[in-house]
Amino acid sequence: SRIEGRPRREIFDVIISDLSTINCKNLLLTHFHMDHLSGLLYMMKNRDSSLDFGKIYLPDVFSKEEMSRTLVLLLLADLLKESGLPSRQVSLFALVDALLENRQNLELLSRGKIFEDKYQALWPDTDVIQRETDKVYNEICKNENLAAVMEELLNFAEKLRRIIWSMTEEGKAQTEKEQEKISLAYVYDREFRRIKAIPEFKELLSFLN
């Protein structure tokens, strides 16, 4: 095998070399774990036009405003995996950050949707995800000390959701006023750092642990 036993960066370079020979490339991202996302981020930062994707397919946790609650839980889950490492990259935020630097054509997939004229998505079931999200989210917010920081996270997650949505065909039809609300990547990085510095945020992570 060309990649067996090689360091991750070399593996990415081999894959990139193969991809550069394909004229039309679409990519399916099934979930947002960093081990799956890191290759995409590496390629997007490569900025080689031969690696441009025609379309990137993502799980639909972005098409409706109420899905921002799900994004809050995704952000928290990612932070909790390695809460002892303050420099840890949050995968969902890393994806949005990369997309702001290198905008892509996105399509959101949910259970039952046909894509590429031959494949059918099995996940996510948006109704099931919403029910599970509401149960967990509401349970956290019962703690009065955490309600305010959860609201901060919700507002932040909604901004991330709008960024992803703006790169879909449906989202591109947004009014110009909505598009103007999308800022540069560093603005969101600064806001995320501010939220993580809130004392109640540390209390929230301790509560969830």
PLM regions and their residue ranges:
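Short acidic, S/G/P-rich loop/turn micro-motifs used as interaction or catalytic elements
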Residues: R2-R6, M34-D35, S63-E65, D127-I129
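Generic alpha-helical structural element
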Residues: E4, L29, G84-R88
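Active-site metal-binding motif and surrounding structural segment of the metallo-beta-lactamase
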Residues: G5-L58
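Flexible, acidic/histidine-containing loops and adjacent segments that form or flank the divalent-metal
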Residues: Y42, N46-N209
